[in-house]
């Protein structure tokens, strides 16, 4: 599958403020299925001489008729900057962020406690009970 897949970048921009390089990625894959994001990350890592863990690709859309897919990619200078600037859902896709999930019962109890008070007191109730 790797032999006829071409990756091109355009609208390349170095964003010094967020310590990253950002670009539009065109993937040419005639007669083949859409290329997995992991494979795109690995190929970009080779192109830009970095590791795949600091590369974030998203928003890929395959053009009508297939053969060409376009998306967006960002290469951070380090993993720390990526964790600081990337949205949590994108970090979760890489396994860098785990959302803490409260139980359904706890969420319902909190909601019902919040309904009983009005105004600024909601902040105290929402924080939870002090022990």
From Swiss-Prot:
Family the entry assigns: Belongs to the eukaryotic ribosomal protein eS24 family.
Biased composition (Basic residues): 101-119
GO terms (BP aspect): ribosomal small subunit biogenesis; translation
GO molecular-function terms, A-Z: structural constituent of ribosome
Known partners and oligomeric status: Component of the small ribosomal subunit. Part of the small subunit (SSU) processome, composed of more than 70 proteins and the RNA chaperone small nucleolar RNA (snoRNA) U3.
Listed name of the protein: Small ribosomal subunit protein eS24
Gene3D superfamilies reported for this sequence: 3.30.70.3370
Keyword Acetylation set for record: yes
Subcellular location field: Cytoplasm; Nucleus, Nucleolus
Positions of post-translational Phosphothreonine modification: 9
Role, per record: Component of the small ribosomal subunit. The ribosome is a large ribonucleoprotein complex responsible for the synthesis of proteins in the cell. Required for processing of pre-rRNA and maturation of 40S ribosomal subunits. Part of the small subunit (SSU) processome, first precursor of the small eukaryotic ribosomal subunit.
Biased composition (Basic and acidic residues): 90-100
Species, as recorded: Bos taurus
Region feature Disordered, mapped onto this chain: 90-131
Domain of life of the native organism: Eukaryota
Record-level GO cellular component terms: cytoplasm; nucleolus; ribosomal subunit; small-subunit processome
Keywords, comma-separated and alphabetical: Acetylation, Cytoplasm, Isopeptide bond, Nucleus, Phosphoprotein, Ribonucleoprotein, Ribosomal protein, Ubl conjugation
Cross-link type Glycyl lysine isopeptide (Lys-Gly) (interchain with G-Cter in SUMO2), residue numbers: 37
InterPro entries (alphabetical): eRP_eS24_sf, Ribosomal_eS24, Ribosomal_eS24_CS, Ribosomal_uL23/eL15/eS24_sf
Modified residues (N-acetylmethionine): 1
């Amino acid at each position: 599958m790797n032999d006829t897949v071409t990756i091109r970048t355009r609208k390349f921009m170095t964003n010094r403020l967020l310590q990253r390089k950002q670009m539009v990625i065109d993937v040419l894959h005639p007669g083949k299925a859409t290329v997995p994001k992991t494979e795109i990350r690995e190929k970009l890592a080779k192109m830009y001489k970095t590791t795949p863990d600091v590369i974030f690709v998203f928003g890929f859309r395959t053009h009508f008729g297939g053969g060409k897919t376009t998306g967006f990619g960002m290469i951070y200078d380090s993993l720390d900057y990526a964790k600081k600037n990337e949205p949590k859902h994108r970090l979760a896709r890489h396994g860098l962020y785990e959302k803490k999930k409260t139980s359904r019962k706890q969420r319902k109890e909190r909601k019902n406690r919040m309904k009983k008070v009005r105004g600024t007191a909601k902040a105290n109730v929402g924080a939870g009970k002090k022990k």
